[in-house]
Design a protein with these regions (language model features):
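Exposed alpha-helical structural elements
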Residues: 18, 63-67, 86, 149, ...
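Short alpha-helical "patches" and their helix-cap loops
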Residues: 31-42, 281-288
Length: 365
């Protein structure tokens, strides 16, 4: 069994790639940047470990909120359940299944169980001989995974509080022609509100402030050694806890499906596209501030990826000092962007609604 209308394309972020590729099955094209912007989940999250293992840093505050799909007039359904049958029932209806999994449990990633992350998404687009065909944003070709391995990835409890919890999503139909000039403001306003005043202090700008404080303590909290999988040989080795933390942060920023720069380049491009479309300088100013933040995040992530098991203590301390300085500058830039978008509403005079319709790919793809 294979869903022949599905075309695999790699992408920047697992979640937006999955949505983009499944929407294309219904004949609709949206860019990943627009899907990220409309979904409203952009932001920041920081979860401190109680041991000396690496703290968790993420660039989103919601995982598959479904807001983008609702704003675009897409009828979708979410469900939970383990085992293959619940997935095959949907695929028999020619519906690709967007499955949430623990990245470290996907055998074709060859991570050997290292760096668990339960907020990863893949599309299931085929099944034969006990193997699912997987469309993964990180690969240029389709992958395969056994039913048992997929079930382990979907039921993993290894990355609290971000476990997959057996969630799956399908798109049933697409109706209507969305107006970015209307739904875009709604999405931005909701996102900014959640970043400025999140539901818990680990998220948004308060979370970024917590992160800055946590980083300042890493020289005391990230001591001793921890086990870490090295990309050089794929093996698990004992490494400095601080080195593990710094490289893990680099991976979170640049590698693990964020589009680079912890989603900041993607969101700044969304703001720029939206601002150009509706002629709103407030959006363009915020896009510029977020672009500057994106540059800092990207440089930071790339530098941290250079940290290795052989990095000396002096090198680690130098990287830590640079990180502290960068986070302080990032906070100021992102605060400026969010304050500029606080309670944003459509301009009294803007482009006609007809011109703002997302009815051609030139507007958003």
């Amino acid at each position: 069994m294979h869903i022949h209308s599905y075309q695999h394309r790699a992408g920047l972020n697992c979640e937006t790639t999955c949505m983009r590729n499944v929407l294309a099955v219904h004949g609709v094209e949206f860019s990943e940047e627009v899907l990220l912007g409309l979904d409203g989940g952009f932001g920041f999250g920081y979860f401190e470990r109680r041991d000396n293992g690496p703290d968790i840093v993420i660039g989103r505050q919601q995982i598959f909120s479904g807001q983008a799909l609702r704003l675009l007039g897409v009828r979708a359904r979410s469900f939970q359940g383990s085992g293959a049958a619940i997935l095959l029932d949907q695929m028999k209806l020619e519906r690709p299944v967007i499955a949430r999994v623990d990245l470290s449990e996907l055998p074709y990633w060859n991570s050997h169980g290292g760096a668990p992350f339960g907020g990863y998404f893949i599309n299931l687009v085929g099944h034969a001989d006990g193997q699912f065909t997987v469309s993964d944003s990180g690969f240029s070709q389709l992958q395969t995974i056994s039913e048992d391995a997929l079930n382990r990835a979907r039921t993993s409890k290894r990355s609290p509080p971000i476990n997959p919890e057996r969630w799956c999503h399908v798109i049933e139909s697409v109706c209507g022609t969305p107006d970015l000039g209307r739904v875009g403001y709604f999405a931005v306003e909701n996102c900014v509100r959640d970043v400025l005043k999140p539901s818990i202090g680990n998220l948004g700008l308060p979370g970024l402030k917590q992160f800055a404080a946590g980083v300042r303590n890493w020289s005391r909290t990230k001591t001793g050694t921890v086990k870490m999988q090295l990309w050089t040989d794929g093996g698990v080795h004992d490494v400095s806890a601080l080195a593990c933390q710094l490289q893990s942060l680099g991976r979170a920023i640049e590698v693990f499906g964020t589009g680079g720069g912890l989603f900041r380049p993607m969101w700044s491009r969304f703001l720029h596209t939206f601002g150009d479309l509706v002629g709103d300088e407030r959006l363009l100013d915020a896009a510029q501030a977020m672009s500057s933040s994106a540059h800092l995040w990207t440089m930071l992530g790339r530098n941290l990826l250079e940290v290795g098991p052989d990095s000396g203590q002096a090198t680690l301390e130098q990287q830590l000092e640079a990180l502290i300085d960068a986070i302080d500058r990032i906070y100021q830039l992102e605060r400026k962007a969010m304050d500029g978008l606080r309670s944003i509403r459509p301009l009294a005079t803007r482009v006609p609604l007809a011109a703002a319709h997302l009815n051609t790919t030139s507007n958003f793809a």
